[in-house]
């Protein structure tokens, strides 16, 4: 994608086996080869997923070490991601590393170009600890990235005079990628200045706006579902918007705004949200059942908060889905294996509450407000954890019995 827009990128080839890696290195025929793990996460270098090889033997050794390895980085979570492919890339003589990205600044309501001389590092850490090291250029969407803005950024990053025009051109090309491919993020980290005074993208990350993919079949063709969270992929197939957050309190909500507010209120009251799950505005009982299946597949989940405001959705339809889910999960016994708190408001709410009340589902509790529901589910999760902890502790040995004369038996 970057090459299509005129950006310089090191030559490289994908490798799925150790032998592929060696053959790719032979094709490159360069004294230095970089072996890179290909996973959808940053921080690979710190986790041992990027190695520099100076011979074919080292390429073979590093490929054998990395392929099949589970890399754990700041972006993968504690479970990590398994490496199933590599990128074998030609090395280059680096003079200096930089950071460059384009993204939408929601507060400024425009695209912003961000640059830093602290390239190759975790930019979030740089922004938190040294915000003065990050330069910004706000871009008028009608004009686009102006030449003077690109050159001002290049000078601000202290590019050598001989490379200023090349750096500015690089920025213009990356902006064209961002706009042309409907990106939500176009990031090059590091963007490097080589000893030959070329400006190249040594590593890059592109995020795309899902709602525009219909006009980018080339991007859709590159999608690798194996790199995606399988529950998130399953949810998408069911018409659900699901994001795994790794906590123990699951939530099911209609509407992205209400879902974010629900996640926030769980966190604010001391809970740990397990997911963001928006069932949308066209929910059916079958969709609610599918949502429950996805949530319950997460073994970390200890409680569920359902927060529904009926508008397009009908509360009675949601309630029917909850009843069906309880029957399915309990094999017809009308109970949930973990506490489920339900807060219903809006369209057909009285009918929805009646359906839940008459179903007599064990482990199902009503709530009249979002905060009450959050507090209740957190309390029940903590009580369950305490019971499990007490059950796991070994019983104290019984005290020795005494005879009438006081002798111990």
Predicted feature locations:
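P-loop/Walker A phosphate-binding loop and immediately adjacent motor/lid segment at beta-alpha junctions
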Residues: 337
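Catalytic core of bacterial c-di-GMP phosphodiesterases, primarily the EAL and HD-GYP domains
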Residues: 311
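ATP-dependent carboxylate/acyl-activation modules
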Residues: 1-188, 192-306, 316-320, 327-334, ...
